Design a protein with these regions (language model features):
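Surface-exposed molecular-recognition determinants
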Residues: 1-176
Length: 176
């Protein structure tokens, strides 16, 4: 059967109200990864995923090792997500907000397919989407089981135990 993109990726627009427990619905599935941003101003991009747990938000521009937007999301639900108690970036009063949502395989489980085992891998082979957590081993050529049926075309990584920025690989980028 053909893949219907809206069953695996959906964008939601909503207006913030600065209230804990606000349900954001209309996604059409339970997200595994949500990238959220106020559309005006200089507010940060905030990333939440099911592999690390919905409450473990990351501000994409920060280089810190720790989760830095914790509790801005309380949970993922069957049609979206619930805003948490520290929602400055994803539910500011009267802010126009966009949430890009991807469907994966839920909270995930360990994966031993590569030379580095993952702690959690949440993959949806129909969508070609996977998100995982793992501990690197500083070995050139190491592989990580991603749960997909073919090699990923886009990869984004971020250290969780040390300061540093994101690294992004795209199949079309042939420059080092």
């Amino acid at each position: 059967p053909a893949v219907i993109p809206s069953e695996y990726f959906n964008t939601i627009l909503y207006t913030g109200d600065d209230q804990t427990g606000k349900s954001i619905t209309g996604v059409g599935f339970q997200p595994t990864f949500s990238w959220i941003k106020e559309m005006q101003g200089t507010a940060h991009h905030v990333l939440h995923d099911a592999a690390r747990g919905a409450t473990a938000g990351r501000i994409s521009s920060n280089r810190t090792a720790v989760e830095d937007a914790t509790d801005s999301m309380a949970s993922f639900n069957s049609d979206g997500f619930v805003v948490g108690s520290s929602a400055a970036y994803i539910n500011s009063n009267n802010a126009s907000i966009v949430a890009w949502n991807w469907k994966g395989g839920g909270a995930g489980s360990s994966n031993t397919e590569g030379s580095i085992n993952t702690t959690k891998t949440s993959a949806d082979t129909d969508a070609g989407f996977s998100i995982m957590t793992y501990t690197g081993n500083a070995t050139e050529g190491a592989t990580i089981g991603h749960g997909l049926t073919k090699a990923p075309e886009v990869v984004m990584t971020k250290k969780r135990d040390a300061t540093g920025g994101y690294m992004v690989f795209h199949i079309g980028n042939t420059d080092a």
